[in-house]
Regions:
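Glycine-rich helix-loop-beta junction characteristic of Rossmann-like nucleotide cofactor-binding loops
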Residues: 190-196, 268-270, 291
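Glycine-rich phosphate-binding loop and adjacent beta-alpha segment
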Residues: 280-345
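Short amphipathic alpha-helix with an adjacent loop that forms part of the alpha/beta core around
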Residues: 257-271
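C-terminal capping/lid region of NAD(P)-dependent oxidoreductase domains
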Residues: 270, 339-357
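Local beta-strand N-terminus motif with an aromatic residue
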Residues: 246, 269-274, 317
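Glycine-rich beta-strand-centered segment in the early N-terminal region that forms part
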Residues: 32-47, 60-131
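NAD(P)H dinucleotide-binding glycine-rich loop of Rossmann-like/cofactor-binding domains
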Residues: 85-91, 100-103, 112, 125-197
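Mid-domain Rossmann-like dinucleotide-binding core that forms the NAD(H)/NADP(H) cofactor-binding site
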Residues: 172-250
Length: 357
């Protein structure tokens, strides 16, 4: 008889007791015992959160030493990932606090869930809850793909009863679906936040979440609205220009928040943005977003590199009366919503296939 589990997975928390799995310092990742309300997953790929992978990669380069070959850097990435799991029983970045998601096959379903959910053993799924709360065991790291933040492994994971997931669709490659589902909350939230005729600013427009948000924002604001895409690297700037989803595309490479503010002020004739969406995967972008948004406007911080303290105190410090939404990656129906964008837009699907599939 399987032991009874808590809906939210608190039975897997080792330390400190009484907290939920996400903030817990350590989880029980023993996969030999399955609780009655858990789903055991045979893991194929970890899709590491962009902010987390960027941090791990930068840390690995420091550890490997200046000028170290790529192979040495990747070995350091492996060490850091394995250490995260060894110390915590899950893959939560010890500096950013963020995780990611995974792709795998349902290996076993707890007795209390069998027949009550739309899953069966053998189904291929992507988890839509963070790796920062998912019990994980890594047996072997097979391949690291730093350009897409994906790591193929041999290992097991647990999805709790409250955990959400998406079945991998039949009409697109698994890696393509995984890459889109990783950021599914961003375009779905964009659809809720943007209205006809508004000016929408997207920071990090040339990245994975940024491209999806640009596409959705333009649909929502229509011909009388304006979508401004700001990217960083020359490559990402050209990428979002070529897609044609934005009315204006600019590069912010090497610019300070004040310089970006002055650029947006010029582009909007001093009116600033109604909605600003921050998809940048590095820290210290909070004030750029706040400065560029008009009073009573909305700033949506999708990036996991966001500091609530910097955003809230920074906004207060300049007397900015903006409404801030902090990294809410979930909204109802977000998985199917985002996959549908790839079906709707041949341009978007093509670039995602080239970059991520």
């Amino acid at each position: 008889m399987q032991p009874k589990g808590n809906k939210y997975g608190t039975h897997r928390v080792i330390e400190p007791k009484g907290v939920l799995p996400q903030p817990a310092n350590k989880l029980d990742n023993n996969m030999d015992v399955l609780y009655d309300n858990e789903i055991l997953i045979d893991v194929q790929t970890l899709n590491i959160d962009s902010a987390s992978f960027t941090d791990i990669h930068n840390y690995a380069k420091q550890q490997a030493g200046e000028g170290a070959p790529v192979e040495k850097v990747m070995e350091e990435v492996k060490k850091e990932m394995l250490l995260n799991v060894e110390l915590q029983g899950k893959h939560r970045n010890r500096r950013t606090g963020s995780g990611g998601m995974l792709l795998g096959k349902v290996e076993k379903i707890g007795d209390a869930l069998k027949g009550k959910i739309n899953l069966k053993e053998g189904d291929r799924i992507a988890t839509l809850v963070s790796l920062s709360l998912t019990p994980l065991r890594i047996d072997e790291i097979l391949e690291i793909r730093p350009e897409v933040d994906q790591v193929d492994i041999k290992g097991k994971a647990i999805l709790f009863e409250s955990g959400i997931y998406a079945k991998i669709p039949n009409d697109m490659p698994e890696k393509l679906a995984l890459s889109a589902l990783d950021v599914a909350g961003a375009p779905a939230q964009t659809a809720k936040l943007c209205q006809y005729g508004q000016t929408v600013l997207i920071l990090g427009a040339g990245g994975k979440s940024g491209m999806l948000c640009c596409y959705e924002a333009k649909k929502r604001v229509g011909v009388t609205g304006k979508v401004i895409g700001i990217a960083n690297s020359p490559k990402s700037t050209q990428r979002i220009k070529d897609l044609g989803f934005c009315d204006v595309v600019e590069s912010a490479a090497g610019m300070t928040p004040v310089q970006v503010y002055e650029m947006v002020e010029r582009l909007t004739d001093g009116k600033m943005a109604d909605v600003t969406i921050n998809c940048v995967n590095v820290p210290d972008q909070e004030m750029t977003a706040v400065l560029c948004t008009k009073d009573d406007g909305i700033v949506y911080f999708f990036s996991m590199a966001t500091s609530f303290t910097k955003a809230s105190l920074g906004a207060e410090g300049i007397g900015s009366d903006v409404n801030m939404i902090m990294g809410n990656g979930y909204t109802k129906g977000h998985a199917e919503f985002t996959l549908q964008e790839l079906r709707e837009s041949p341009e978007l699907r093509k670039i995602f296939e080239e970059l991520y599939a």
